[in-house]
Amino acid sequence: LEKNDVTTLATLLGPDSEDVVSSGDEVADANARADFVASFKTRHTLVPEGSSSMTLVVGDDDWPLPIPIVAEDGKWYLDGAAGADELVYRRIGHNELGAIAVCRGFIDAQLEYASAGHDGNEPGVFAAKLRSDPGMQNGLYWPTAEGEPESPAGEAVARATAEGYKAVTGKRKPYHGYFYRFLFAQGAN
C-alpha cells in the first residue's frame, strides 16, 4: 500500500478484486491508500470475529477494514471477495458526500460570479463553464496574478490540484468518483 502498487495489492486480495483495488479515479484511490497507511501507522489492531475471522481496525477513529482476514486450512488470508461489496458501498457513500460538497461549492461559486459583472456583462449573469477562455472571465475559474482577487472557483481548483488532480487533457477523468458538466436547460423528464 505504501508503494501504491496496484498489481501486488490485486494479487494479495485475490481474483476478481479489480473493484476493490480501483474505483477508476486514480487520484482518489492513491489518496485513500495513503490515508489508510497513515491511519495504520497511527494505530492498528486485529479484532477477532469468531475463531476463523478477524477484522483489522486502524487509526484514531477505529476504522474497520471491510475486507475480513479469514482462516482456512490453517492459513490466514485477506478475503477480497467477501469485502468487495462493503468496500464499494463505502466508496460510493464517500463519493456521494463529495459530490454533494462539489454541488454546494458550485452554487457558491456561481452566486459569487453573478454578484459582479464580468467581460462586459451586468451583475446577475451566471457562468456557462468552469474554466474561462484565455484572457476572459467567462467561466468560474481563471488564473490570477498575485494581489488580484481570486476567481470564484479558484479555491476549489487549488484544493483539487493539491489532492493531485490535473487539468483535463484528452480523456475525461472522474473527480471523487463522478463526472460533472453544466446543464443549460431542463431535460424532457
Which residue ranges define each predicted feature?
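Conserved hydrophobic/amphipathic alpha-helical signal-anchor segments
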Residues: 1-10, 84-137
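Intrinsic-disorder/low-complexity, polar/charged segments
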Residues: 5, 24-25, 151
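Loop/turn elements at helix/coil->beta-strand transitions in domains of secreted/extracellular proteins
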Residues: 5, 74, 176-178
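Generic structural hydrophobic/aromatic packing signal, biased to beta-strands
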Residues: 9, 56, 78, 106, ...
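Extracellular/periplasmic head regions of type IV pilus-like filament subunits
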Residues: 13-16, 116-189
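Surface-exposed, charged secondary-structure patches
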Residues: 14-65, 166-188
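Short beta-strand edge/turn micro-motifs at domain boundaries
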Residues: 53-97, 104
